[in-house]
């Protein structure tokens, strides 16, 4: 047998073995989106007032995708762009939802687009009978390391000290302990100058708790102006934080983060309250931040997160996504499980039950694990949910989509 013939035969056999487990492209079911619904979970109490709305996208093929995020009005408008469309054209649908109206999507609408995008990827995985991380090329890590905010660990009480919380977090298997530099009761006085003195003592206690080989994180939560952020970062440098989170205000991040970078030596992380690829592009390229806080569904879903991850991988910047909800976290495990750079996720659901999600996250010993369940790997108990929205008709009012000659979507 000639070498060329042999190689061709081997390649064909390998392809046959691989494709034997999957439907051929031509055999993929033709389907259309027929209905989008949104629900509130039982006793909704979203962390930090973020949306825990559950979103479903139904198709005429009997496959339903599950997502999380958004609010009634922003979901209604974006969902209306999906009715009658093929859910397998995810990038095209994302571009349409993002570009079809006069104003570019702001943060609230981007969150809704992200929730719907998660459901579209869930459908894609279910069509192929594969977890989304396999659809995206396969996981590159065995698990995702996690950090725990405030040491919310079974057995730790409300009167536990910072040192006790930090120690318990590391002993539970988490990579890092996280606490807020600005944690005070709402509607009370906040003096940034005085808070920095308190901050130094708390950071010293956190370091003592995690030990010399453990990690800890402090969140400034944007409550410090630039001068106090500089002072705060320099005051705690000796205690070696894994990173300082959101040290300056969102409104000025493009100006203040580059300035802060030149004034301090601690690693910086930012972006939980803002962040599409254009927001992060220059900051990542110039290494003004060491870790990107981009998260789901806030950035616009998995479709947009993959592009942000590509920026981070190009410039060797890590990703430490903010926690928004359990379904979104399942999507993060699938999405960032395929990212080859450093990843650490926020997880605060240890010991908590989720009645509407009998199957969701695979968490053990401070780590989140990928699984082999199709799609995002989550299942809903519909009896636990309260419907707040149903969309069955396309939204065309004031929507205008334009196309290049090749059929790709261009600007409004």
Locations of regions flagged by a protein language model:
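N-terminal secretory signal peptides
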Residues: 1-2
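N-terminal export signals
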Residues: 5-26
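C-terminal segment of N-terminal export signals and the immediately downstream linker at the start
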Residues: 20-48, 57
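Metal- or metallocofactor-binding catalytic centers and their adjacent structured scaffolds
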Residues: 36, 58-130
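Conserved, mostly hydrophobic/aromatic
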Residues: 62, 116, 129, 219, ...
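Shared catalytic-loop signature of beta/alpha-barrel
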Residues: 77-78, 85, 89-92, 234, ...
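Metal-dependent enolase-superfamily TIM-barrel catalytic cores that perform enediolate-based chemistry
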Residues: 143, 151-258
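Extended hydrophobic packing segments that form well-structured cores
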Residues: 376, 380-412
